[in-house]
Amino acid sequence: MKQYNVTGMSCAACSARVEKAVGKVPGVTACSVSLLTNSMGVEGTAEPSAIIAAVEAAGYGASEKGAAQSSPSADEQQLEDHETPRIRRRLIWSVGFLLVLMYFSMGHMMWGWPLPPFYDNNHVAMGLTQLLLTGIIMVINQKFFISGYKALWHRAPNMDTLVALGATAAFGYSTYALFAMTAAQVRGDEAAVMTYMMDFYFESAAMILTLITVGKMLEARSKGKTTDALKSLMSLAPRTASVLRDGREVEVPVEQVQQGDEFAVRPGESIPVDGVVLEGSSAVNESALTGESIPVDKAPGDGVSAATVNQSGYLRCRATRVGQDTTLSQIIRMVSDAAATKAPIAKIADKVSGVFVPAVISIAAVTTAVWLLLGHPVGYALARGISVLVISCPCALGLATPVAIMVGSGLGAKNGILFKTAASLEETGRVQIVALDKTGTITSGQPRVTDILPAEGVTEQELLTNALALEQKSEHPLARAVLDRAAGLTAPEVSDFQALPGNGLTAVLEGKALWGGSAAFTEKRAAVSPDLQAKTEELSRQGKTPLFFGAEDRLLGVIAVADVIKEDSPRAVRELRNMGIRVVMLTGDNQRTAQAIGAQAGVDQVIAGVLPEGKEAAIRRLMQRGKVAMVGDGINDAPALTRADTGIAIGAGADVAIDAADVVLMNSSLLDVPAAIRLSRATLRNIHENLFWAFFYNAIGIPLAAGVFIPLGLTLNPMFGAAAMSLSSFCVVSNALRLNLFKLRDNRHDHKRTNHLNNENKEEQTMEKTLEIKGMMCPHCEATVRTALEAMPQVQAAQVSHESGTAVVTLTAPVEDDVLRRTVEDKGYTVTAIR
């Protein structure tokens, strides 16, 4: 997506006009314009020159965001609030002249304030003074007229058009009344003079412009605050780096750091670019990127990220990613892109905004005509029409969604939760089912020793020492768990080491044969006591892998290894279920291991034995029951992440640019999943509130201004209409800013949405059939049979075991035995019985 800066936009009608104009350019496949950030994202093959020309033809300005603007410091300067100071200056001058105008126009008549003798009974001089003061205020606020009439000329009227028409009508009619009064005074018609003098609306024109400027300033200040999170991220970017050149440290601008450069970071300094530690150790505070306040220990070989703070030790690092490739830059780009895209819910406001201003102009014209036809004076009828023009506010509609999206995505980024698009921020809160990959998501992804069971007469240290001697030459993933557990122990070198695939390990230590492996491998070498056998079977039921170790024909003991679940996983699952979300675990493990992990985590359903392509099929089946979010590590889960309604990559760390995911979680904590859903729901709720206020305001305000409620004694003059218009946008933006107070990790106020999926096992009539199958030899065979059976629409789940040679199928509707038999036998296996 190419990014552009757009100038000259003042309301939702402007952004809709630009979007429509660019959308017609050949080669443009998608266009999204953000009124909040005055930016535009365009996808397609169209040339930038053609896109800029289309924007200019629509009456606005555009420029491509170039490389010079792509550094965080340049982007930060671009986000600086330049608008508020300009509007403040306009407002100060406008208020100054307005006070003088109000003194002349109303002070003398209403409160008897003294006037210079020159104005005594000099009505023409009084009128000319008001005309002059109003003209000055109109010149000060000429932006409304230039923008409004320019948009009208391009047949794309906007909010400025409404203000300009209202102020022009009031000023024009007042000028006519002044000339008519002058003629009456020349004729000596005092009655006509007083009548025309009462038709002066100079103060209304000036007040409209001043009050709209007040609203614009409040809106600009509030809009500036919505980008605070993004600006705070940009401010984290270090400006300089201490690069090692010819053995000396040289301080250079961070933009000059090249990939492969070595740089030094002292305690208390920010790390300038992404890199890898070459020398030194330290604790690094990564809260700026992940939201996690606990420092992370770094040693040689560990990665470090830009904008994180070195707290305790000296580090020498090599730059691996610089400039726009750093983690910080990618996060900033994600937040900016999310703000530049549009949420699906915004389409409602966009459709209304496209016809809103022309409709309001028509209503104002009809209102004026109706009151004239009813016999009211021109001034009265014109006041009603002007009120309609100045109270109508397309800005409130246009800002309702983008301000909430900006605040929500910024708040997420500060807490390590990155939404790639506005649509992902909206859709995440609507999920009904969360599918969790087991390894690295529910579990740590790193096998650890959980139990040590020495045989009778063997000490724990003796068992660990022999296991260490054997495993230190192994490359098996489970060997790392044993080595970590035996850290601090020393073991002699073994000889004649052999790794027997699928069986175990053998070696010779001091003339004795050492061995280690599975239960089947052990049966041929040593006897296992009934007590130890019972304990290992219990460990297997818990999803742990027992490793048997022995010397010669003697069993030394058992070490159990497992990919243990993270401490916060059960709590995260519990929070998801309390939010009314069904939690499903997907894993390639066998059914027994998967069920054990699933029980510890507390999930609603376990789908085991699925390969990456099987996970994608499982997601497709789950999507038939509701909106699904898939949570995985973004590596082998890419097909499932892409298939799901919302793909969530967890524990991304520095690899934030995961293409398959819609949401990226910087931490490895599963608690960020309910936090992301909670934030999405709060943002969506805020958008609904904003849209309700915007529609309600216009639905009530326009009829009130037109005089529909005058029979009930309710009327509205143009000045109050302008004040209401000014406050409407301010209220919408202020409501969005309330999101900054939202505690996205506080589950005390979670609302449990009604979700029949969590009760489906109680409500759904199910039946089970057991298939006896020959030919299954391994977990891969289990996965093949399970995938084939669960692809059937009537099959809710299939539990397959190659050890027992059975498949237990849970059905939601009757299926003929021959159909089940054929489904399995088509995969090359034999069904001997179905019961």
Task: Give the residues covered by each predicted segment.
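Flexible metal-binding regulatory segments at protein termini and peripheral loops
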Residues: 1-125, 223, 232, 248-251, ...
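Conserved ATP-binding TGD loop and adjacent catalytic N/P-domain core of P-type ATPases
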Residues: 16, 29, 267, 431, ...
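Conserved cytosolic catalytic loops of P-type ATPases
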Residues: 26-49, 200, 231-325, 422-467, ...
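Transmembrane helix-loop-helix hairpins at the membrane interface
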Residues: 86-240, 351, 718
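ATP-driven catalytic headpiece of P-type ATPases
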Residues: 89, 308, 429-475, 503-584, ...
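Membrane-embedded alpha-helical bundles of multi-pass transporters
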Residues: 110-124, 153, 172, 411, ...
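Juxtamembrane coupling segments of multi-pass membrane pumps/enzymes
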Residues: 181-184, 190-191, 206-267, 298, ...
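Conserved catalytic phosphorylation-site environment of P-type ATPases
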Residues: 289, 348, 383, 396-470, ...
